[in-house]
């Protein structure tokens, strides 16, 4: 059995957004730490971080209804949405920091402003969405969220979803107009460029 003589302070498995972000954070905190990063595919960011393999919403909790489950008592728990959104805000701050430090790091290449819409039908789902909206609206992270049951307004928010619908069908939607779409594969590549010759 061959014994490797390579030594490193930190071994990271996976060259996606999480592995590269961890490598970046470590190097920013202590540039002397030796990191080895391994990826089984032929390039970084091709599995879960790849644009077509990921929702790309930034997982900000704006439109992910499963982040605000309703309990058996009928109460909606928004805690997960608040936690996820605050973590996403930290990601945005870190990318802003990298952008100020490295000229090659341009968040505009992987972040696009994209409204986040949740659309529901029927009394039960509309009641859930309205309760969710009223709870989230109270928190500063969700202050820009809007709610509507007006079909014309919803058509302006998400026109393709409303065409040809039954005029008598009850519908409701929420929108956060300052949502984002993230290409985590491209973000992985941008972070890797800041790590060139460092790991």
Predicted feature residues:
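Helical element adjacent to the flavin cofactor pocket in flavoenzyme catalytic cores
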Residues: 171-199
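Dinucleotide-binding Rossmann-like beta1-alpha1 core, especially the glycine-rich loop
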Residues: 56-156
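Short hydrophobic segments within beta-strands
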Residues: 13, 38, 119-120, 177
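N-terminal Rossmann-like FAD-binding beta1-loop-alpha1 element of flavoenzymes
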Residues: 8-36
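A short, basic/flexible loop-to-alpha-helix module at the beginning of a structural domain
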Residues: 1-8
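Glycine-rich FAD pyrophosphate-binding loop
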Residues: 27-51
